[in-house]
Amino acid sequence: MEKKVYYSIVSSTRFSRNEENRTIIEDNIKKGENHFLIRNDDYGECFEVDFEKNITEEENENWILEAVIDFAKKYRITEFELWKKHEGDSTYDKGFGIVIEGSMDNPILKFKEVYSGSLDDWNITWGKGKQTYEKIYFKLAL
């Protein structure tokens, strides 16, 4: 059975441990870039993108990690929080943090910590025995 699920990808100046991330977010807010805003809650200045999907319980959620990779490459942000809630829930009650390691040409997403719920609440394919997500990118020689 399909359910409506809401997802949010966030990176905040208040919770980022990386000075470069904070600067990127602050600079993009000043420029008025899409997805960069000032929230009236704990997050304050942040990057935020929300998604709404109709999915089944078994459906793979790796797409959200692919979206994080795309945003990391585009904006050079290296710390994110991923959140989700199901239709009818008032708050995002399942969330975890990740960091981007390695080069942006071949990024590795590494699990940082769970904020709410558990990783079992997500249908994500982590690397063998690790909590990392990695794709191998090949550059074609022309």
UniProtKB/Swiss-Prot annotation:
UniProt keyword annotations, A-Z: Plasmid
Any Pfam family matching the protein: DUF5514
InterPro entries the UniProt entry points to: DUF5514
The protein's name in its UniProt record: Uncharacterized protein pXO2-83/BXB0113/GBAA_pXO2_0113
Annotated organism of origin: Bacillus anthracis
Lineage: Bacteria, Bacillati, Bacillota, Bacilli, Bacillales
